[in-house]
Amino acid sequence: MILVNTDYITGKELETLSIVKGSTIQSKHIGKDIIQVFKTLVGGELKAYNDMMNEARAIATKRMVEEAEQLGADGIVNIRYASAAVMQGAAEVIVYGTAVKFI
């Protein structure tokens, strides 16, 4: 499965199949959340939140790829990510793109 954020894959003719997406909502353990609150007071990277967002992007991408595979896709083009806070310490990540088949 080829994943790109462009509307083409070099050297391939594409047949559009469908839009595909994946999403997840992730949160951190309350103990880690409290540690991150203190971290905002002194500055620096919020590693627990950074790790949470990286994990969320990976899960959402996996779900999008699984949806594309069910369609028989060879790739996904025009991939875009979006995220939003749904509550304190929890975030939703959604990824979407266009599933394509090589002609």
Positions of the model-derived regions?
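Short, solvent-exposed loop/turn elements at beta->coil junctions and helix N-caps
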Residues: T6-I9, Y81-V86
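Membrane-proximal amphipathic alpha-helices
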Residues: V86, A91-E92
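Short, well-ordered alpha-helical segments
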Residues: V20, I25, D33-R80
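N-terminal presequence-like segments and the immediate start of the first folded domain
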Residues: M1-K32, Q70-D74, V93-I103
